[in-house]
Amino acid sequence: MFKGGMGNMMKQAQQMQERMQQAQEEVANMEVTGEAGAGLVKITMLGNHNVKRVSIDPSLMEDDQEMLEDLIAAATNDAVRRVEETSKERMSEITGGMGLPPGFKMPF
C-alpha cells in the first residue's frame, strides 16, 4: 500500500515539475510594459527581464535630460515590478493546491 502511495506521490511531483517548467518558459516569453510620466515613457520588458522596447513621447525630447532619465528609470522599475507580479501570479496558479507556505521556492 505504501509503495502505491509513494509512486503516486512521485508521479504528482513529476507532473508538477513539468507544469512548473512550462510556466517558467511562458513567463520568460511574456511581455509587460512599465510606464512613467502618465505614459509618456514606456518600457516593454520580457519575463526574463530583458528590455525589448523603449518608447519616449516626442514632447519629452524638448525637456531637460535629467527629467527624461528619471522617467526612464521609473518606467524600467515599473516594468520589473510587473514582471515579478505576473511571474508570481503564474507560479501560484500552479502551486495553489499544494498548500505551500508563502515564499516557499520549489527546487526545480
From Swiss-Prot:
<comment type="function">
    <text>Binds to DNA and alters its conformation. May be involved in regulation of gene expression, nucleoid organization and DNA protection.</text>
</comment>
<dbReference type="InterPro" id="IPR004401">
    <property type="entry name" value="YbaB/EbfC"/>
</dbReference>
<keyword id="KW-0238">DNA-binding</keyword>
<comment type="subunit">
    <text>Homodimer.</text>
</comment>
<dbReference type="GO" id="GO:0003677">
    <property type="term" value="F:DNA binding"/>
</dbReference>
<protein>
    <recommendedName>
        <fullName>Nucleoid-associated protein IL1848</fullName>
    </recommendedName>
</protein>
<dbReference type="GO" id="GO:0005829">
    <property type="term" value="C:cytosol"/>
</dbReference>
<keyword id="KW-0963">Cytoplasm</keyword>
<dbReference type="InterPro" id="IPR036894">
    <property type="entry name" value="YbaB-like_sf"/>
</dbReference>
<feature type="compositionally biased region" description="Low complexity">
    <location>
        <begin position="9"/>
        <end position="26"/>
    </location>
</feature>
<comment type="similarity">
    <text>Belongs to the YbaB/EbfC family.</text>
</comment>
<dbReference type="Pfam" id="PF02575">
    <property type="entry name" value="YbaB_DNA_bd"/>
</dbReference>
<dbReference type="GO" id="GO:0043590">
    <property type="term" value="C:bacterial nucleoid"/>
</dbReference>
<feature type="region of interest" description="Disordered">
    <location>
        <begin position="88"/>
        <end position="108"/>
    </location>
</feature>
<feature type="region of interest" description="Disordered">
    <location>
        <begin position="1"/>
        <end position="26"/>
    </location>
</feature>
